[in-house]
């Protein structure tokens, strides 16, 4: 049978999602816990391979197993064998043609900025601290230049392995919740570091160093060296993955749970 899981994790102490030799990854910890429940080796496939320090509240994985377990056992049993910073949120049996990555039609990320003069000792690895005042409204206006299908070479990491820089951004919203600025972006897919590169360029606009039209200009240049540096990893969350309704993938609160809109 094939099982899909919803996964939440704090990526602070992991070297990204993907299993690697000699370093700890989220995938490694999850597979070890699932293998205990299944009493057999389990390999998982994820919707999005997040980088070192990046978090997930809406990650989706699937795996195949011959072990017959109640769905709640894949949740409670796995959680009992996971570290505190990784958790299974739900489990469903899915059809054989489901694939966590290739069946996905969209992914959604949130980047959380703690915009305050002084840093906080709470959630130091769960938000990115920027001490200078940011105009979130200008950031939002600038972000609208990125909507639709475009060549995102200006916001693509040099080591990106994707065959094409073209992506389709469905929405990009910037809002303020108290001292938190939330950059919420959804696209069919993302090139490597795309969200973090966009965010740091939007911060340039929010701080007043660049006009809102600068984002439109950057997009047209298709040159990564002209955009801002890559934003810090700790503010980024994979919050949702979209699938066709026929797969029956549950919908949950986007997170992270400290935001008021949850």
UniProtKB/Swiss-Prot annotation:
Substrate binds at residue 109. This is tRNA pseudouridine synthase A. InterPro entries: PsdUridine_synth_cat_dom_sf, PsdUridine_synth_TruA, PsdUridine_synth_TruA_a/b_dom, PsdUridine_synth_TruA_C, TruA/RsuA/RluB/E/F_N. The keyword Nucleotide-binding does not apply. Homodimer. Formation of pseudouridine at positions 38, 39 and 40 in the anticodon stem and loop of transfer RNAs. GO terms for molecular function: RNA binding; tRNA pseudouridine(38-40) synthase activity. HAMAP family: TruA. Keywords: Isomerase, tRNA processing. Belongs to the tRNA pseudouridine synthase TruA family. SUPFAM superfamilies: Pseudouridine synthase. One of its GO terms (biological process) is tRNA pseudouridine synthesis. Its EC number is 5.4.99.12. The active site is at residue 51.
